[in-house]
Regions:
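ATP/NTP phosphate-donor binding region
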Residues: 1-102
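Solvent-exposed alpha-helices and their adjacent loops that cap or buttress functional pockets
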Residues: 96-98, 121-122, 150-151, 158-162, ...
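Active-site segments that bind and position negatively charged phosphate/pyrophosphate groups
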Residues: 202, 207-315
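A glycine/threonine-rich phosphate-anchoring loop and its flanking beta-alpha core
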Residues: 11, 117-210
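Short glycine/serine/threonine-rich phosphate/pyrophosphate-binding segments
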Residues: 110-117, 138-139, 256
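C-terminal charged capping/lid subdomain of soluble metabolic enzymes
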Residues: 2-6, 187-189, 287-363
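Non-catalytic interfacial helical region
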Residues: 89-106, 115-130
Protein backbone atom coordinates (compact mmCIF):
# COMPACT_ATOMS: atom_id res chain seq x y z
CA UNK A 1 0.00 0.00 0.00
CA UNK A 2 1.37 3.39 -0.97
CA UNK A 3 1.59 5.67 2.04
CA UNK A 4 -0.09 8.98 1.41
CA UNK A 5 -0.40 12.56 2.53
CA UNK A 6 -3.21 15.05 1.94
CA UNK A 7 -3.43 18.75 2.75
CA UNK A 8 -6.43 20.55 4.24
CA UNK A 9 -6.08 24.24 3.43
CA UNK A 10 -8.12 27.44 3.52
CA UNK A 11 -6.22 30.55 2.45
CA UNK A 12 -5.54 32.89 5.36
CA UNK A 13 -7.27 30.59 7.83
CA UNK A 14 -5.72 27.15 8.31
CA UNK A 15 -3.66 24.45 6.68
CA UNK A 16 -2.62 21.05 8.00
CA UNK A 17 -1.58 17.66 6.63
CA UNK A 18 -3.33 14.31 6.89
CA UNK A 19 -0.89 11.40 6.96
CA UNK A 20 -2.03 7.89 6.01
CA UNK A 21 0.55 5.47 7.39
CA UNK A 22 0.90 1.85 8.52
CA UNK A 23 2.72 2.50 11.81
CA UNK A 24 3.75 5.23 14.27
CA UNK A 25 7.37 5.47 13.04
CA UNK A 26 6.85 8.68 11.07
CA UNK A 27 4.80 10.50 13.73
CA UNK A 28 7.84 12.34 15.05
CA UNK A 29 8.88 13.40 11.55
CA UNK A 30 5.37 14.69 10.87
CA UNK A 31 5.42 16.74 14.08
CA UNK A 32 8.84 18.15 13.22
CA UNK A 33 7.66 19.08 9.74
CA UNK A 34 4.94 21.23 11.31
CA UNK A 35 7.41 22.85 13.72
CA UNK A 36 5.77 21.40 16.82
CA UNK A 37 8.83 19.81 18.46
CA UNK A 38 10.39 20.83 21.81
CA UNK A 39 7.06 21.48 23.49
CA UNK A 40 5.46 20.11 26.61
CA UNK A 41 3.08 17.34 25.46
CA UNK A 42 -0.04 15.86 27.01
CA UNK A 43 -1.28 12.60 25.48
CA UNK A 44 -5.05 12.36 25.90
CA UNK A 45 -6.48 8.87 25.50
CA UNK A 46 -9.02 6.48 27.00
CA UNK A 47 -8.99 3.22 28.93
CA UNK A 48 -9.50 1.13 25.78
CA UNK A 49 -6.75 2.68 23.66
CA UNK A 50 -4.13 3.29 26.36
CA UNK A 51 -3.15 -0.39 26.83
CA UNK A 52 -2.82 -0.81 23.05
CA UNK A 53 -0.93 2.24 21.81
CA UNK A 54 -0.06 4.68 24.60
CA UNK A 55 3.46 3.39 25.28
CA UNK A 56 4.38 3.17 21.58
CA UNK A 57 3.28 6.76 20.96
CA UNK A 58 4.87 8.10 24.16
CA UNK A 59 8.14 6.34 23.33
CA UNK A 60 8.17 7.90 19.85
CA UNK A 61 7.39 11.38 21.19
CA UNK A 62 10.30 11.29 23.65
CA UNK A 63 12.55 11.99 20.67
CA UNK A 64 11.09 15.50 20.36
CA UNK A 65 10.00 16.35 23.90
CA UNK A 66 11.52 15.92 27.35
CA UNK A 67 8.25 16.75 29.10
CA UNK A 68 5.44 14.30 28.36
CA UNK A 69 2.50 13.47 30.61
CA UNK A 70 -0.83 11.77 29.99
CA UNK A 71 -4.54 12.07 30.73
CA UNK A 72 -6.44 8.78 30.52
CA UNK A 73 -10.21 8.72 31.06
CA UNK A 74 -12.72 5.88 31.11
CA UNK A 75 -13.76 4.97 27.57
CA UNK A 76 -17.28 5.60 26.31
CA UNK A 77 -19.61 8.30 25.05
CA UNK A 78 -21.01 8.65 28.57
CA UNK A 79 -17.73 10.29 29.59
CA UNK A 80 -17.64 12.81 26.74
CA UNK A 81 -18.85 15.60 28.99
CA UNK A 82 -17.81 18.75 30.84
CA UNK A 83 -16.86 16.78 33.96
CA UNK A 84 -14.15 14.94 32.02
CA UNK A 85 -13.02 18.21 30.42
CA UNK A 86 -12.67 19.73 33.90
CA UNK A 87 -10.47 16.80 34.93
CA UNK A 88 -8.36 17.42 31.82
CA UNK A 89 -8.02 21.11 32.75
CA UNK A 90 -6.87 20.10 36.26
CA UNK A 91 -4.24 17.76 34.83
CA UNK A 92 -2.97 20.48 32.48
CA UNK A 93 -2.77 23.03 35.30
CA UNK A 94 -1.04 20.58 37.67
CA UNK A 95 1.58 19.92 34.99
CA UNK A 96 1.98 23.65 34.27
CA UNK A 97 0.95 23.39 30.64
CA UNK A 98 1.34 26.78 28.96
CA UNK A 99 0.17 28.24 25.65
CA UNK A 100 3.05 26.56 23.79
CA UNK A 101 1.90 23.13 24.95
CA UNK A 102 0.61 20.44 22.61
CA UNK A 103 -2.26 18.01 23.18
CA UNK A 104 -2.16 14.66 21.36
CA UNK A 105 -5.59 13.07 20.84
CA UNK A 106 -4.89 9.33 20.70
CA UNK A 107 -8.08 7.36 20.16
CA UNK A 108 -11.47 7.37 18.52
CA UNK A 109 -14.08 10.05 18.01
CA UNK A 110 -14.82 10.57 21.70
CA UNK A 111 -11.14 11.17 22.48
CA UNK A 112 -10.69 13.46 19.48
CA UNK A 113 -13.80 15.54 20.17
CA UNK A 114 -13.00 15.97 23.86
CA UNK A 115 -9.31 16.71 23.32
CA UNK A 116 -10.07 19.24 20.62
CA UNK A 117 -12.58 21.00 22.85
CA UNK A 118 -10.09 21.05 25.71
CA UNK A 119 -7.44 22.49 23.38
CA UNK A 120 -9.85 25.13 22.06
CA UNK A 121 -10.74 26.42 25.53
CA UNK A 122 -7.65 25.93 27.73
CA UNK A 123 -5.81 29.27 27.96
CA UNK A 124 -8.15 30.48 25.17
CA UNK A 125 -6.73 27.93 22.76
CA UNK A 126 -3.63 25.77 22.40
CA UNK A 127 -2.42 23.45 19.64
CA UNK A 128 -3.47 19.83 19.31
CA UNK A 129 -2.96 16.99 16.87
CA UNK A 130 -5.25 14.10 16.01
CA UNK A 131 -3.96 10.51 16.07
CA UNK A 132 -7.20 8.63 15.32
CA UNK A 133 -7.28 4.88 15.99
CA UNK A 134 -10.83 3.98 14.89
CA UNK A 135 -12.33 3.86 11.42
CA UNK A 136 -14.96 6.47 12.25
CA UNK A 137 -12.37 8.90 13.59
CA UNK A 138 -10.08 8.38 10.60
CA UNK A 139 -12.75 8.98 7.96
CA UNK A 140 -14.77 11.65 9.71
CA UNK A 141 -14.32 13.17 13.15
CA UNK A 142 -10.54 13.77 13.12
CA UNK A 143 -10.75 16.02 10.04
CA UNK A 144 -12.47 19.39 9.99
CA UNK A 145 -12.01 21.01 13.39
CA UNK A 146 -15.37 20.23 14.97
CA UNK A 147 -14.80 19.70 18.67
CA UNK A 148 -17.24 19.28 21.51
CA UNK A 149 -18.84 17.34 24.32
CA UNK A 150 -22.33 16.13 25.12
CA UNK A 151 -24.51 18.04 27.59
CA UNK A 152 -27.61 16.69 29.35
CA UNK A 153 -27.41 13.76 26.89
CA UNK A 154 -27.63 16.10 23.90
CA UNK A 155 -24.95 15.14 21.39
CA UNK A 156 -22.11 17.67 20.90
CA UNK A 157 -24.24 20.46 22.37
CA UNK A 158 -21.21 22.33 23.73
CA UNK A 159 -18.30 22.78 21.35
CA UNK A 160 -16.09 24.95 19.19
CA UNK A 161 -14.39 24.96 15.80
CA UNK A 162 -10.68 24.36 16.39
CA UNK A 163 -8.59 22.86 13.61
CA UNK A 164 -5.82 20.37 14.48
CA UNK A 165 -2.24 21.11 13.48
CA UNK A 166 -1.97 17.69 11.84
CA UNK A 167 -3.81 14.38 11.55
CA UNK A 168 -1.75 11.19 11.68
CA UNK A 169 -3.50 7.93 10.81
CA UNK A 170 -1.84 4.60 11.53
CA UNK A 171 -4.15 2.32 9.59
CA UNK A 172 -2.73 -0.80 11.21
CA UNK A 173 -4.64 0.20 14.36
CA UNK A 174 -7.79 -0.92 12.53
CA UNK A 175 -6.58 -4.53 12.84
CA UNK A 176 -7.34 -4.38 16.58
CA UNK A 177 -10.73 -2.73 16.12
CA UNK A 178 -13.76 -4.63 17.48
CA UNK A 179 -16.29 -5.58 14.77
CA UNK A 180 -18.86 -3.22 16.26
CA UNK A 181 -16.46 -0.27 15.96
CA UNK A 182 -15.67 -1.21 12.36
CA UNK A 183 -19.40 -1.27 11.58
CA UNK A 184 -19.70 2.14 13.23
CA UNK A 185 -17.13 3.62 10.84
CA UNK A 186 -18.87 2.12 7.84
CA UNK A 187 -21.99 4.13 8.66
CA UNK A 188 -20.07 7.37 8.09
CA UNK A 189 -18.33 5.99 5.00
CA UNK A 190 -21.58 5.00 3.29
CA UNK A 191 -22.96 8.42 4.23
CA UNK A 192 -20.03 10.11 2.52
CA UNK A 193 -20.71 8.31 -0.75
CA UNK A 194 -24.44 9.01 -0.60
CA UNK A 195 -23.79 12.73 -0.16
CA UNK A 196 -21.75 13.39 -3.28
CA UNK A 197 -20.08 10.35 -4.86
CA UNK A 198 -22.25 7.64 -6.39
CA UNK A 199 -19.22 5.78 -7.77
CA UNK A 200 -17.59 5.67 -4.33
CA UNK A 201 -20.79 4.42 -2.66
CA UNK A 202 -21.03 1.57 -5.16
CA UNK A 203 -17.31 0.82 -4.80
CA UNK A 204 -17.76 0.40 -1.05
CA UNK A 205 -20.81 -1.82 -1.51
CA UNK A 206 -19.23 -3.94 -4.26
CA UNK A 207 -16.00 -4.54 -2.33
CA UNK A 208 -17.62 -5.37 1.00
CA UNK A 209 -15.90 -8.78 1.36
CA UNK A 210 -12.36 -7.36 0.99
CA UNK A 211 -13.09 -4.25 3.05
CA UNK A 212 -14.61 -6.32 5.88
CA UNK A 213 -11.48 -8.49 5.90
CA UNK A 214 -9.49 -5.28 6.56
CA UNK A 215 -7.51 -5.49 3.33
CA UNK A 216 -5.05 -2.60 3.78
CA UNK A 217 -5.06 -1.65 0.11
CA UNK A 218 -8.86 -1.38 0.11
CA UNK A 219 -8.91 0.43 3.45
CA UNK A 220 -6.32 2.93 2.24
CA UNK A 221 -8.29 3.71 -0.91
CA UNK A 222 -11.54 4.03 1.02
CA UNK A 223 -10.14 6.18 3.83
CA UNK A 224 -8.28 8.45 1.41
CA UNK A 225 -11.43 9.13 -0.62
CA UNK A 226 -13.42 9.95 2.51
CA UNK A 227 -10.69 12.35 3.64
CA UNK A 228 -10.57 13.99 0.20
CA UNK A 229 -14.32 14.60 0.28
CA UNK A 230 -14.35 15.83 3.88
CA UNK A 231 -11.30 18.06 3.33
CA UNK A 232 -12.88 19.65 0.25
CA UNK A 233 -16.08 20.45 2.11
CA UNK A 234 -14.21 21.82 5.14
CA UNK A 235 -12.00 24.04 2.97
CA UNK A 236 -15.05 25.57 1.29
CA UNK A 237 -17.25 25.83 4.40
CA UNK A 238 -15.23 25.44 7.61
CA UNK A 239 -17.93 26.65 10.02
CA UNK A 240 -21.00 25.00 8.49
CA UNK A 241 -22.61 28.09 6.99
CA UNK A 242 -23.83 26.09 3.98
CA UNK A 243 -22.39 23.06 2.18
CA UNK A 244 -20.85 21.46 5.27
CA UNK A 245 -24.35 20.75 6.59
CA UNK A 246 -24.59 18.03 3.92
CA UNK A 247 -22.22 15.97 6.08
CA UNK A 248 -25.13 15.69 8.52
CA UNK A 249 -27.01 13.28 6.24
CA UNK A 250 -28.58 10.67 8.52
CA UNK A 251 -27.65 12.60 11.65
CA UNK A 252 -30.97 14.28 12.55
CA UNK A 253 -32.79 11.00 13.20
CA UNK A 254 -29.48 9.31 14.09
CA UNK A 255 -28.70 11.69 16.94
CA UNK A 256 -32.27 11.40 18.26
CA UNK A 257 -32.02 7.60 18.31
CA UNK A 258 -28.56 7.77 19.89
CA UNK A 259 -29.87 9.95 22.72
CA UNK A 260 -33.07 7.96 23.34
CA UNK A 261 -31.17 4.66 23.38
CA UNK A 262 -28.92 6.24 26.03
CA UNK A 263 -25.86 5.79 23.80
CA UNK A 264 -26.20 1.98 23.87
CA UNK A 265 -25.81 2.08 20.09
CA UNK A 266 -22.60 3.54 18.67
CA UNK A 267 -22.74 6.78 16.70
CA UNK A 268 -22.13 5.19 13.29
CA UNK A 269 -24.82 2.59 13.92
CA UNK A 270 -27.31 5.37 14.63
CA UNK A 271 -26.17 7.22 11.50
CA UNK A 272 -26.93 4.03 9.54
CA UNK A 273 -30.49 4.01 10.88
CA UNK A 274 -30.72 7.72 10.10
CA UNK A 275 -29.62 7.06 6.51
CA UNK A 276 -32.52 4.62 6.09
CA UNK A 277 -34.96 7.23 7.43
CA UNK A 278 -33.55 9.93 5.13
CA UNK A 279 -33.64 7.57 2.15
CA UNK A 280 -37.25 6.62 2.89
CA UNK A 281 -38.30 10.28 3.15
CA UNK A 282 -36.46 11.02 -0.10
CA UNK A 283 -38.24 8.11 -1.79
CA UNK A 284 -41.62 9.31 -0.52
CA UNK A 285 -40.93 12.66 -2.17
CA UNK A 286 -40.04 10.98 -5.45
CA UNK A 287 -36.37 11.90 -5.22
CA UNK A 288 -35.14 8.31 -4.88
CA UNK A 289 -36.54 5.33 -6.76
CA UNK A 290 -37.68 2.25 -4.90
CA UNK A 291 -34.69 0.41 -6.36
CA UNK A 292 -32.27 3.06 -5.05
CA UNK A 293 -33.89 2.89 -1.62
CA UNK A 294 -33.42 -0.87 -1.52
CA UNK A 295 -29.83 -0.48 -2.73
CA UNK A 296 -29.10 1.80 0.22
CA UNK A 297 -30.73 -0.64 2.65
CA UNK A 298 -28.76 -3.52 1.15
CA UNK A 299 -25.48 -1.57 1.40
CA UNK A 300 -26.09 -0.77 5.07
CA UNK A 301 -27.12 -4.35 5.83
CA UNK A 302 -24.00 -5.76 4.14
CA UNK A 303 -21.88 -4.00 6.77
CA UNK A 304 -24.14 -5.14 9.64
CA UNK A 305 -25.57 -1.68 10.24
CA UNK A 306 -29.00 -1.85 11.90
CA UNK A 307 -31.92 -1.13 9.58
CA UNK A 308 -34.28 -0.55 12.50
CA UNK A 309 -34.32 -0.07 16.28
CA UNK A 310 -36.69 -1.34 18.95
CA UNK A 311 -38.20 -0.05 22.18
CA UNK A 312 -38.67 3.51 20.94
CA UNK A 313 -41.78 5.61 20.36
CA UNK A 314 -42.06 7.55 17.08
CA UNK A 315 -43.35 10.64 18.89
CA UNK A 316 -40.40 10.62 21.26
CA UNK A 317 -37.95 10.37 18.37
CA UNK A 318 -39.69 13.27 16.60
CA UNK A 319 -39.55 15.38 19.78
CA UNK A 320 -35.83 14.63 20.15
CA UNK A 321 -35.16 15.83 16.58
CA UNK A 322 -36.67 19.20 17.55
CA UNK A 323 -33.85 19.71 20.05
CA UNK A 324 -31.19 19.04 17.45
CA UNK A 325 -28.48 21.72 17.31
CA UNK A 326 -28.98 21.93 13.53
CA UNK A 327 -32.40 23.61 13.98
CA UNK A 328 -32.65 27.01 12.32
CA UNK A 329 -35.48 29.49 13.04
CA UNK A 330 -37.65 26.64 14.31
CA UNK A 331 -37.08 24.47 11.23
CA UNK A 332 -35.04 21.31 10.94
CA UNK A 333 -32.29 21.51 8.33
CA UNK A 334 -32.91 18.02 6.98
CA UNK A 335 -30.57 16.48 4.41
CA UNK A 336 -32.36 14.68 1.58
CA UNK A 337 -31.04 12.67 -1.35
CA UNK A 338 -31.84 13.44 -4.97
CA UNK A 339 -30.54 10.10 -6.19
CA UNK A 340 -27.51 8.21 -4.90
CA UNK A 341 -24.51 10.54 -4.65
CA UNK A 342 -26.57 13.73 -4.65
CA UNK A 343 -27.85 15.53 -1.57
CA UNK A 344 -29.29 18.89 -0.57
CA UNK A 345 -30.49 20.84 2.46
CA UNK A 346 -34.26 21.02 2.92
CA UNK A 347 -36.11 23.12 5.50
CA UNK A 348 -39.64 22.12 4.45
CA UNK A 349 -39.84 18.61 5.91
CA UNK A 350 -43.11 18.38 7.86
CA UNK A 351 -43.68 16.57 11.13
CA UNK A 352 -45.91 14.05 9.37
CA UNK A 353 -43.27 13.30 6.74
CA UNK A 354 -40.66 12.85 9.43
CA UNK A 355 -42.97 10.65 11.50
CA UNK A 356 -43.51 8.36 8.51
CA UNK A 357 -39.75 8.05 8.04
CA UNK A 358 -39.24 7.41 11.76
CA UNK A 359 -41.89 4.67 11.78
CA UNK A 360 -40.00 3.00 8.92
CA UNK A 361 -36.99 2.43 11.19
CA UNK A 362 -38.88 1.35 14.34
CA UNK A 363 -39.86 -2.23 15.21
Amino acid sequence: MAEQKLLVKREGDFHYPIYLKNDFQDLVGAIREEGLENRKICIVTDSHVAPLYHEAVKSALQEISSEIFSFVFEAGEKNKNLNTVQELYKTLIENEMDRKGLLVALGGGVVGDLTGFGASTYLRGIDFIQVPTTLLAQVDSSVGGKTGVDFLQYKNMVGAFHQPRLVYMNMSTLQSLPNREFTCGMGEILKTGLICDEEFFRFVCKNQPEISKLDLSMLSRMIRRCCEIKAGVVERDPKEQGERALLNLGHTVGHAVEKLKNFQLLHGQCVGVGLIAAAYLSMQRGLLTGEEYEEIRKGCHSYNLPLSVDSLNAGDVLAATKKDKKMEAGHIKFILMDGIGKSFIDKTVTDEELLQAIREILV
